[in-house]
Curated annotation (Swiss-Prot):
A motif ('HIGH' region) lies at residues 273-283. The gene is MARS1. It comes from Homo sapiens. Its main location: cytoplasm. The modification Phosphoserine is found at residue 825. GO terms for biological process: cellular response to epidermal growth factor stimulus; cellular response to platelet-derived growth factor stimulus; methionyl-tRNA aminoacylation; positive regulation of transcription of nucleolar large rRNA by RNA polymerase I; rRNA transcription; tRNA aminoacylation for protein translation. A motif ('KMSKS' region) lies at residues 593-597. CDD domains: Anticodon_Ia_Met, GST_C_MetRS_N, MetRS_core, MetRS_RNA. Changing residue 880 to A: Strongly decreased affinity for tRNA. Pfam families: Anticodon_3 (PF19303), GST_C (PF00043), GST_N_5 (PF18485), tRNA-synt_1g (PF09334), WHEP-TRS (PF00458). This is Methionine--tRNA ligase, cytoplasmic.
Length: 900
């Protein structure tokens, strides 16, 4: 058969990606033709893509061609896939065609483009989130995924048009985009020109009618409540009524924590931070804070959990720092290890072990793995040309030399890796190299070194990845980085250095050398555990019983997904390898980068001097966690999130619920007689709680935080609509209703305190103390919403949880930490000219929007006159527009009315 495609024709993307399905089952010849070539003789207009079958017949519908390839591969049709294909043709394509036309032909940007397709993108995101599966039709990729990916790729390959808040869509799109057939399809059709490659094709298309891009009504945006079945409501009520008796007994505490047969044993690591660096906020969110959230969640689930980290203390970075400070390398390690430990303690990081790599156990385990690799023929010897500084009389390994990156031209690349493009570098490849210590130009000299024979281990690695990746929770960027290295072919990697500070090489002729830090740094996880317990092998040589989660920033991925697995596989000693590799993108500071030397950005040892509590830092860093793409810390945004999400939403609800118990019922939880509306609220809270669990089990940490805030908003609306402060003054029935509303609200507050524990442990403990939540309910989180504060339960003294951040305070901190280059919020890429209002004006507008939104909800709940509701809705829309302008954002196109 023969497949005809053309450059710059969007329909060719999915068919080329789907053609990979037919490999090995049929011979497919791919021919590139011009878009005006008539391939199908009986069509009146030129058409591509076209599949000419061996029978001589033609298929010229994109979905039909894709379906044919999938059927050839043995794929079986299903109703859900067919539904997605119908939706793609009738709903997505018209909206997407309009968006691409506006972008490429008319040169529009931002919401003018995204507005026409936003509803469709949101539908995909909600569907993926609701079913909690990686693909549209379930756990495995289907025809629907390829067809929709191909349709969306020209637009979404630009991150500006992939909304960050649609995280499920983001993850799905990244997963597919990193697959080799999809990458080849994109290269063939777009020719590295991006969406502009479609210009000639789109210019020949008719201008879309307004209806194709329209999503306009006068209804304000509201959160969409899922439709509940009677069974879901009944199950929620049953779980609620069982209360505390549903809780299982607490797991007994172990010391040391060791794997237990028959239980889920979760081993969690954070990438080991270089000891000589004080971590900034980006380092903290990328490794330790993200892992801490998951470790705390694992303990709430009663999983047998061990969480470890430590300082990476060997290597050139330590020697360089020692020279700078006039100390020995060991003195540098001792000094900065304490600094790291103090920072993580202040941030409430709940390590079971925080160790270090300068230990006898590190030497013993590293040398043992090396000897096993050497014995099995996986170590090579070779002569290496190295840079040597004649002035300092030393070889310039790794961080002792800087120069221009040979790949991307970055002027401060190190001798081992470029921080900008992430590529590994041999020091002699640097352009314009300089000694980091004296800044003189080095000379090239030869030296004998040892190499890990990665090409010889590549097949084992690919087989292991083939077993591990399906069904795992590797982040898309981790998969992409790993696959890109394998696609280029692994090369032998030098594992020794001409240094004094490191793990000695136990081989004759190499006594004056040490192991390269990234050969032995990942072995640090094992040695840190060995210093914790002499039974460390029960964790690290037990892949059948241990689930290993490793957290890091994306620049550390190759060493965890390639170098250490190859070392462990080559040693053939049944080592536990990573099951789930969780990598973040980068966190920037305002509109620049963190820089200790320039005094730009907040570093860990400075955060505690700001007067802002550790839990507020934790909340904001997790709220902006760079999961799918780089994100940026913003002082203005920190103020807004604290004052809106924490103070006005979460804190307001929990404080009101507790205060009503104290003020109206003497501090005792009142009797609750649930109405059908109350029972529906139980079911909605239960669904959101289950969504929270689904997200955290998939390590979607930022998204799960949104579930907490959503439940809090439900609670605020519930109180606002039912007005217990008024009902308590009314009839007996009114007072009973006030009691029910108050009792249910304070139980929601109790649930939120437990859900908050992984994110804000101090705030969580404060809420639980105020409510005097029974101890078992503080330490276990089930998937159902339980009544943990029954009628008659006495609560403690209730007080506000959060303090308002003031504009003067934030502006002072901005100036102090070098944020002067970003006195206004970073401008969205889609806006050409904006004027940002002062934070106090923004806050005032946010308060007005909240107040007006409550008025609208109350009127709707009371089924008020339509004209009265419409008038208040108009006020709300106007306030939202004012707020968008004040924040420097384009006012969003109003969304269509949602079906109830």
């Amino acid at each position: 058969m023969r497949l005809f495609v053309s450059d710059g024709v969007p329909g060719c993307l999915p068919v080329l990606a789907a053609a990979g399905r037919a490999r090995g089952r049929a011979e497919v010849l791919i021919s590139t033709v011009g878009p005006e070539d008539c391939v199908v003789p009986f069509l009146t207009r030129p058409k591509v893509p076209v599949l000419q079958l061996d029978s001589g017949n033609y298929l010229f519908s994109t979905s039909a061609i894709c379906r044919y390839f999938f059927l050839l591969s043995g794929w079986e049709q299903d109703d859900l896939t067919n539904q997605w294909l119908e939706w793609e043709a009738t709903e997505l394509q018209p909206a997407l065609s309009a968006a691409l036309y506006y972008l490429v032909v008319q040169g529009k940007k931002g919401e003018d483009v995204l507005g026409s397709v936003r509803r469709a993108l949101t539908h995909i995101d909600h569907s993926l989130s609701r079913q909690n599966c990686p693909f549209l039709a379930g756990e495995t990729e289907s025809l629907a995924d390829i067809v929709l990916w191909g349709a969306l790729y020209p637009l979404l390959q630009d991150p500006a048009y992939l909304p960050e808040e649609l995280s499920a869509l983001h993850s799905w799109f990244q997963t597919l985009s990193t697959q080799e057939p999809c990458q080849r399809a994109a290269e063939t059709v777009l020719k590295q020109q991006g969406v502009l490659a479609l210009r000639p094709y789109l210019q020949k298309q008719p201008q879309p009618s307004p209806a194709e891009g329209r999503a306009v009504t006068n209804e304000p945006e509201e959160e969409e409540l899922a439709t509940l079945s009677e069974e879901e409501i009944a199950m929620a009520v049953t779980a609620w009524e069982k209360g505390l008796e549903s809780l299982p007994p607490l797991r007994p505490q172990q010391n040391p924590v060791l794997p237990v047969a028959g239980e889920r044993n979760v081993l969690i690591t954070s990438a080991l931070p270089y000891v000589n660096n004080v971590p900034h906020l980006g380092n903290i969110i990328g490794c330790v804070l993200s892992a801490d959230v998951f470790a705390r969640y694992s303990r709430l689930r009663q999983w047998n959990t061990l969480y470890l980290c430590g300082t990476d203390e060997y290597g050139t970075a330590t020697e360089t720092k020692a020279l700078e400070e006039g100390l020995t390398p060991q003195e540098i390690c001792d000094k900065y290890h304490i600094i790291h430990a103090d920072i993580y303690r202040w941030f409430n990081i709940s390590f079971d072990i925080f160790g270090r790599t300068t230990t006898p156990q590190q030497t013993k385990i590293t040398q043992d793995i090396f000897q096993q690799l050497l014995k099995r023929g996986f170590v090579l010897q070779d002569t290496v040309e190295q840079l040597r500084c004649e002035h300092c009389a030393r070889f310039l390994a790794d961080r002792f030399v800087e120069g221009v990156c040979p790949f991307c031209g970055y002027e401060e690349a190190r001798g081992d890796q470029c921080d900008k493009c992430g590529k590994l570098i041999n020091a002699v490849e640097l352009k314009k190299p300089q000694c980091k210590v004296c800044r003189s130009c080095p000379v090239v000299q030869s030296s004998q070194h040892l190499f890990l024979d990665l090409p010889k281990l590549e097949k084992r690695l690919e087989e292991w990845l083939g077993r591990t990746l399906p069904g795992s929770d590797w982040t898309p960027n981790a998969q992409f980085i790993t696959r890109s290295w394998l696609r280029d072919g692994l090369k032998p990697r030098c594992i020794t250095r001409d240094l004094k500070w490191g793990t000695p090489v136990p081989l004759e002729g190499f006594e004056d050398k040490v192991f390269y830090v990234w050969f032995d740094a990942t072995i640090g996880y094992l040695s840190i555990t060995a210093n914790y317990t002499d039974q460390w092998e029960r964790w690290w040589k037990n892949p059948e019983q241990v689930d290993l989660y490793q957290f890091m920033a994306k620049d550390n991925v190759p060493f965890h997904s390639l170098v250490f697995p190859c070392s462990a596989l080559g040693a053939e000693d049944n080592y536990t390898l990573v099951s789930h590799l969780i990598a973040t993108e980068y966190l920037n500071y305002e509109d620049g980068k963190f820089s200790k030397s320039r005094g730009v950005g907040v570093f860990g040892d400075m955060a505690q001097d700001t007067g802002i509590p550790a839990d507020i830092w934790r909340f904001y860093l997790l709220y902006i966690r760079p999961e799918g793409q780089d994100s940026a810390f913003s002082w203005t945004d920190l103020l807004l999130k604290n004052n809106s999400e924490l103070l006005n939403n979460l804190g307001n609800f929990i404080n009101r619920a507790g205060m009503f118990v104290s003020k109206f019922f003497g501090g005792y939880v009142p009797e609750m007689v649930l109405t059908p509306d109350d029972q529906r609220l139980l079911a909605h809270v239960t669904l959101e709680l289950q969504h929270y669990h689904q997200l955290l089990e998939k390590v979607r940490i930022r998204d799960a935080l949104r579930s907490i805030l959503t439940i809090s908003r439900h609670g605020n609306q519930y109180i606002q609509v039912n007005e217990p402060w008024k009902r308590i003054k009314g009839s007996e029935a009114d007072r009973q209703r006030a009691g029910t509303v108050t009792g249910l609200a304070v139980n929601i507050a109790a649930l939120l305190s437990v859900m908050l524990q992984p994110y804000m442990p101090t705030v969580s403990a404060t809420i639980q103390a105020q409510l005097q939540l029974p101890p078992p309910a503080c330490s276990i989180l089930l998937t159902n919403f339980l009544c943990t504060l029954p009628a008659g339960h006495q609560i403690g003294t209730v007080s506000p949880l959060f303090q308002k951040l003031e504009n003067d305070q934030i502006e002072s901190l901005r100036q102090r930490f070098g944020g002067g280059q970003a006195k206004t919020s970073p401008k969205p890429a889609v806006v050409e000219t904006v004027t940002t209002a002062k934070p106090q004006q923004i806050q005032a507008l946010m308060d007005e929007v909240t107040k007006q939104g409550n008025i609208v909800r109350e009127l709707k709940a009371q089924k008020a006159d339509k004209n009265e509701v419409a008038a208040e809705v108009a006020k709300l829309l106007d306030l939202k527009k004012q707020l968008a302008v004040a924040e420097g954002k384009p006012p969003e196109a109003p969304k269509g009315k949602k079906k109830k």
